[in-house]
Amino acid sequence: GMPLEHHSSSVSVEVVGAGAESSTIRLNHCNAITLGGSTIVFEPELYGSFSPEFTLSDLGKDAADGGVYIAITASYDRLIPVGYPDPNEIPLRHPHLLPEIRITAVPVQSGNEHFLNKDFVIIGKGLLEGHGFVLDDEYIPPVQRLAYSQKLRTSLNSTIVHLNHMEDCIGQIYQKNVDDSRRSTLTSNVFTLCRAIDEYYAHQFFQIENILIEEPPIRYLQSINILARSIFNALRTIPNKEYEYMLQYFYEWTEISPSSFETTVGDVLSLKYNHLDIAKTDRVIQRLVTTLDAIIKKMSELDYIGLIRENIIISDDSNTEQER
């Protein structure tokens, strides 16, 4: 769910204790929704002295060796009395009842997406590191919408920045090269790449900028998969030798090797979405947009496509690199 008031994240956990087996996972706050539609809300102000905790010794070191998913559940058949008793009421009693919230750990090797069909929510991941247990800061818990994850919001904003920058740079590439007398086959092939990105931008950018934030993470991958597929299909129309020359040309100016470029595009096309491993999806997406942006940016900075990068001379005066 969305972060509660006065919190920047929907959920917060911490690890207390020094040793691996003596470490305790403690829930600080959360606002989550299970697939069944049940809400799990925990705030210390609501629950008073009750604090959901789980000690790793209950799981066993061997089970935790491969890492664990941290999960929470709300037991509506086990209620916690909360609130301040009315001194005028006899017998004294707490005025409210809230469901007991429990936190537990599931070995990663035992976890799969079937766990998401139960009435609990995975909120984090932990790893044994040295003699202690640490939270995986890179892990992105399953969320219903990108808006519910700070990491995914940041990733989407980064993608939007890269796409906008590429669109500006593509305009510069066209301006410099479309009427240039030095226009070559290489120029036309770079235009092919630019058009693939351009067409994707025209058809997808409104959705990315305005709608995707309210969509599940798989829609994010779907959108970037369309970009990768557009590029892959466009580049297939270039004869092999010309295609290889273009990738080598990119390599000369950006140090992005042909194999790295092809792997980056291929990783997006082949990735199978895993709701328990959203961080992998995010890494693959960011690698593609940053790689494309670096190439397009450099091509836009050249006087014309086809300019050859000759030997680099190191200036004795300034230690800066200059093209001959």
Roles of regions detected by a PLM:
Residues 44-47, 82-98:
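"Short basic amphipathic alpha-helical interaction patches in structured regions
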Residues 51-86:
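Elongated alpha-helical scaffolds
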